[in-house]
Amino acid sequence: MILMDIKKLFGYEGKTVVVSGAYSGMGLAAARLLHELGAQVYTICRRNGRHSKLDFPAAGELYADFGAKEDIDALADALPEKIDAMFLCHGIALKADASNALEVQKVNFLGHKYLLEKALPKIADNGSVNIIASTGGYGWQDAFADCAAVVNAPSYEAALDWYAAHPDVIRNGYVFSKQCLCAYVKMKVHAPEYIDRKIRLNAINPGNTITGLTDDFNRNTSPNGDAAEGKAVIEAIFLDSWNGRWATAEEMGYPLAAIGSDIFSYMSGQIIYFDYGMSSVWETDALDAAIE
C-alpha cells in the first residue's frame, strides 16, 4: 500500500495563510502546524511582537489591536493580496467586574466581523475562514435575536451604537461575543460574499484549554480574583462530572488547521465542539428535562 503524502492531503504547500492570535496558545499551535505543512504563514500580533516571539519563521508579521477600528483598517491594507485560508484565533477574557465588557465585544466579535468585511476580497475563491469561538458560546440560538442585530449591523459604528443601547446584553461580555461568532458562521455561510466564491466558513468551540488566557479566566471566575478558587469553580462545572482534564492548545489548534484544509473541502457553516462531549451532555439533559 502506498502511503498518502500528508502535505498533499492537507493542501497547504505553497499556500498563503493568515493567523491572528498566533503568538500563544491555540493560535500558535495552528500556525506552527500550518508552517510544517508547507504554508506561507502571516501572523498577527496584538502587541506588535514586543513581548512575543515565534518559534518558526513567518512569511510576515503584522500588528493589530482588534479593539481599534483604525488598526483593523491598516491591517486589512497590509494583508497579502491573496489569502488561501484565514484563521482568527485571538480573544480576551472578561474581567470579574465586567468593566471591559465593550472591549471584549470589540476584540472577540466586532473585530472579526469588520476585518472579514474589509479583507474578504483578498481571500481566494475556494478558500476558507476558520474561527476559534468557545463552548462559552453554547446556547447561541437562545440569544439569536441579539446576535443577529450585531451580525447585521450595517457598519462598525452601528454595532457600537447597538452595544451602547444594550448594556445588559453585553455585560456577560465573553459569552455574548462567542455567541455572536457562532451566529455569524450560521448566518453568513450562504451569504453571497461567501457562497458565490465558495469560501468555506467554520468555527470550533473549544472546551477548557490551557492557554495564555487560562489565568485570566480563573481569576475572573472568582469573586475575589483568586486564580485557585476560580480554577476550582470551573473544574466543578466542566470537568469534575467526568473526571476530566484540561485540553492542550494543540488539541484545539491542530483540528482548526485541519478544518481549514483540503481535507474538509466540502464542510462549511459548521460549529464543531471540542469539549470531550460536555455540550452533548447539556443537549441531552435539556431534551430529558423537556420530556419530563
Language model: regions and residue ranges:
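Short C-terminal tail/terminal secondary-structure segment
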Residues: I2-K8, S268-E292
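Rossmann-fold cofactor-recognition segment
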Residues: F56-E70
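Catalytic loop of short-chain dehydrogenase/reductase
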Residues: A96, S128-I195, N208-T211
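Short, small/polar-rich loop/turn modules that mediate ligand/substrate recognition or access, typified
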Residues: I195, R200, M267-G269
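C-terminal substrate-recognition "lid" of short-chain dehydrogenase/reductases
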Residues: R245-F274, S279-S280
